[in-house]
C-alpha cells in the first residue's frame, strides 16, 4: 500500500500547487494561503497513512495471536505418569529393543531394534553419517520423544516412570548451536544452576576450558554477552555452554557435536578434565571427528538408524568396516562422515 499512498500524496500536492498557482495569478489566493493549504493537506494525508498502517498491524497482530493461542493450547503427548518417581539413582542407561518413529503411521523407523547397555560413569562416543539418527537416539533418554516400541531405562527404571522435571534435571544436553542470552557471563552460566556460587562457576569454566579466554576479558566473568552470544566466537560460545551444563551436576551429560568449533587440542583438554573431575557422570559424546571419541570407553556406530558396531576404538578398528573407513579417511586429511561411510 505504501507506493499507492505516496502516489496519492504527491498527486494531491501537484494538483493543489497547480490550481493554487492559477488562483494566485488572478489574485484570488495568496502565497501564504497556498502554503497553509498544502500543510493542512499533508497533515491530513499523513494521518490517513498512519491510520491505514494501524489497520494493517491490527490484522497481523490478530493472526499472530491466533497462532500463539494454538501453540499454548496444544496438549503434549508426553506427560507425567500417575505416581511418578522423583529420584534418579544413577546415570546407567539401557535401550531394550527400542524402535522409534517420528510419525506413528510411518513404515520406516528412524531407529530400529536398538539394544544397548551403558554403565553409570561410562564415556560413550556416538558416530554416524548425516541422518543416521544420532540425535534422535539421545533425545529418547530425556523423553523429548517417547519410543514407538521397546523401552529406555535410566537408573534401572523406565524413563516413562519418572517425573519429567526430575528426569530432565538429571540430563544435561549441549547442542552444536546453543544459545547465550544478553547478560554477564555469570548470568549465562547460572541458567544451568541459579544457586551456583562464583567459585562453582569458575570451576565449571575451568573444566570446559572457558576460563582461558574469560580471564583475558577486561571485566572477566562480568563481561557482557550480547543476545545470542554475537560478541564471542563459536568455540567460545560452545565452551560457555558446556560449563553451563556442568553446573547442573547432572548424572548424564550429552554433548551433541558441541566441540565442533573447538580446536583438537582444547577438545582433548576438555575430555581429559571430564574423565578426571566427573568420573561418576555418564557422558555421551556425539561427534564427527574420530579424535573426539576414540578414547571413550566404548563407541556406538550408527548407520541408518541401526547399531552397526559397539565397542572400544581398538575393537571397532578390527571388526567394523564403517568405523575403520572413517578413521582412515580422517587420518589422511579428509573429514566428515557421510551416509554409510566417509566423505
Question: How would you name each of these model-derived features?
Answer:
Residues 70, 77, 190:
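Conserved E/DxxT/N motif and adjacent residues on the DHp alpha2 helix
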Residues 20, 27, 74-77, 91, ...:
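Flexible, glycine-biased helix-capping/connector loops in cytosolic signal-transduction modules
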Residues 10-13, 80, 86-343:
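ABC-type nucleotide-binding domain
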Residues 1-66, 71-72:
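Helix-loop-helix
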Amino acid at each position: 500500500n505504501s507506493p499507492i499512498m505516496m502516489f496519492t500524496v504527491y498527486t494531491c500536492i501537484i494538483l493543489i500547487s497547480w490550481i493554487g498557482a492559477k488562483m494566485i495569478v488572478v489574485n484570488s489566493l495568496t502565497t501564504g494561503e497556498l502554503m497553509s493549504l498544502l500543510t493542512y493537506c499533508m497533515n491530513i494525508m499523513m494521518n490517513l497513512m498512519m491510520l491505514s498502517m494501524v489497520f494493517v498491524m491490527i490484522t497481523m497482530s490478530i493472526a499472530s495471536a491466533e497462532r500463539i493461542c494454538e501453540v499454548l493450547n496444544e496438549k503434549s503427548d508426553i506427560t507425567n505418569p500417575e505416581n511418578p518417581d522423583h529420584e534418579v539413582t544413577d546415570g546407567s542407561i539401557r535401550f531394550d529393543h527400542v524402535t522409534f518413529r517420528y510419525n506413528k503411521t510411518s513404515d520406516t523407523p528412524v531407529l530400529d531394534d536398538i539394544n544397548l547397555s551403558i554403565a553409570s560413569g561410562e564415556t560413550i562416543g556416538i558416530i554416524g553419517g548425516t541422518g543416521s539418527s544420532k540425535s534422535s537416539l539421545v533425545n529418547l533418554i530425556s523423553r523429548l520423544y517417547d519410543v514407538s516400541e521397546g523401552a529406555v531405562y535410566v537408573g534401572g527404571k523406565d524413563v516413562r516412570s519418572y517425573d519429567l522435571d526430575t528426569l530432565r534435571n538429571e540430563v544435561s544436553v549441549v547442542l552444536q548451536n546453543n544459545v547465550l542470552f544478553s547478560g554477564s557471563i555469570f548470568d549465562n552460566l547460572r541458567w544451568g544452576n541459579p544457586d551456583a556460587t562464583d567459585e562453582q562457576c569458575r570451576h565449571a569454566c575451568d573444566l570446559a576450558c572457558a576460563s582461558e579466554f574469560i580471564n583475558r576479558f577486561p571485566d572477566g566473568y562480568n563481561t557482557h554477552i550480547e543476545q545470542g552470544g554475537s560478541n564471542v566466537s563459536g568455540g567460545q560460545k560452545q565452551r560457555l555452554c558446556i560449563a553451563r551444563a556442568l553446573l547442573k551436576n547432572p548424572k548424564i551429560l550429552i554433548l551433541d557435536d558441541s566441540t565442533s568449533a573447538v580446536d583438537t587440542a582444547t577438545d582433548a583438554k576438555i575430555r581429559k578434565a571430564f574423565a578426571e573431575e566427573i568420573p561418576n557422570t555418564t557422558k555421551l559424546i556425539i561427534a564427527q571427528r574420530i579424535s573426539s571419541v576414540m578414547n571413550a570407553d566404548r563407541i556406538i556406530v550408527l548407520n541408518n538408524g541401526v547399531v552397526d558396531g559397539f565397542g572400544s576404538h581398538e575393537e571397532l578398528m578390527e571388526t567394523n568396516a564403517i568405523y575403520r573407513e572413517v578413521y582412515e579417511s580422517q587420518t589422511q586429511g579428509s573429514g566428515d562422515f557421510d551416509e554409510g561411510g566417509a566423505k
